[in-house]
Each structure stands twice: as structure tokens, then as C-alpha cells.
């Protein structure tokens, strides 16, 4: 049997692939909210879907339920600048994430929070965390 003859679960069940992608985004950031640093329980669309935002790695960030709910359908950077917990280093991390530079985003998050934990496997460029 050749590798081309194999059938993978991801090919048969798109929901499984989507679930794996969501988990990888949380894992990539150490399961912390990109906005406030609290544990992330959800995925937030930086550019909301209601405004044409897509479910891509570059547009989806890990967020706690509080930040995700408060942001609602606003543009993330505009909303974030008005928050009491605003940190310019996190704002730069969000911008780097949007531009697809996940490595820089993680470095900026580490700078913003020295206790930020990241898997050594996540020091790569993030290309393995792309939505299909």
C-alpha cells in the first residue's frame, strides 16, 4: 500500500480538520488570550466575519470569552486601543499575526508577558497551523 492509497480522517471529516486547526492556534500561543493574556477559550476573528473576515490563521486569534464577547463585531485593533489593559507590545503582536508573521507575534507576546509559555515546537514559522 502506498501513501497515495491511504485515506486520512481529515479528508473524510472537514469538522475534524477544523477542530485540529482551532486547537493548534490555542497551542501556538500557550492557550492565552492575545488581547489580555488570560486563558483563551475561544477563537476571535480580528476582522469580523460580518465585515468580510475569513476563518484563516492570519485572521483568527485565541481570545478569552470576555475579550471575544466585548469586542463583538468591532475591528480588533480599534477596540483594543480603548481597553484599560491595552499594551502596545500586544498591539504589535496582533498586527504581526494579521500579517502572517506568527513567529514575531509570539516573540512580542513573550516580551509583553515574561511568564508567557510557548512550546518549543511552536518556534517554527507557524506554517503548520494553516486552515485548510
What residues fall within each predicted segment?
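Short, charged surface segments at domain edges that flank catalytic/cofactor-binding sites
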Residues: 1-31, 88, 95-108
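Intrinsic disorder/low-complexity signal
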Residues: 4, 10, 43, 122-124
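Short, contiguous, helix-prone interaction/anchoring segments in small proteins
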Residues: 23-28, 32-38, 120-122
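Intrinsically disordered, low-complexity segments enriched in small/polar residues
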Residues: 28, 50-51, 98, 124
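Histidine-centered nuclease catalytic patch
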Residues: 32-62, 71-83
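A detector for short metal-coordination/catalytic motifs
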Residues: 58-59, 69-132
Amino acid at each position: 500500500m502506498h501513501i497515495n492509497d491511504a485515506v486520512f480522517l481529515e479528508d473524510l471529516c472537514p469538522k475534524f480538520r477544523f477542530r485540529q486547526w482551532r486547537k493548534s492556534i490555542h497551542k501556538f500561543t500557550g492557550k492565552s488570550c492575545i488581547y489580555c493574556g488570560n486563558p483563551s477559550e475561544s477563537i476571535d476573528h480580528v476582522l469580523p466575519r460580518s465585515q468580510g473576515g475569513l476563518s484563516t490563521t492570519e485572521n483568527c486569534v485565541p481570545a478569552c470569552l470576555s475579550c471575544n464577547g466585548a469586542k463583538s463585531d468591532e475591528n480588533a485593533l480599534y477596540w483594543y486601543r480603548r481597553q484599560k489593559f491595552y499594551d502596545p507590545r500586544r498591539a504589535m503582536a496582533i498586527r504581526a499575526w494579521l500579517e502572517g508573521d506568527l513567529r514575531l507575534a509570539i516573540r512580542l507576546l513573550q516580551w509583553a508577558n515574561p511568564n508567557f509559555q510557548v512550546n518549543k515546537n511552536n518556534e517554527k514559522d507557524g506554517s503548520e497551523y494553516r486552515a485548510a
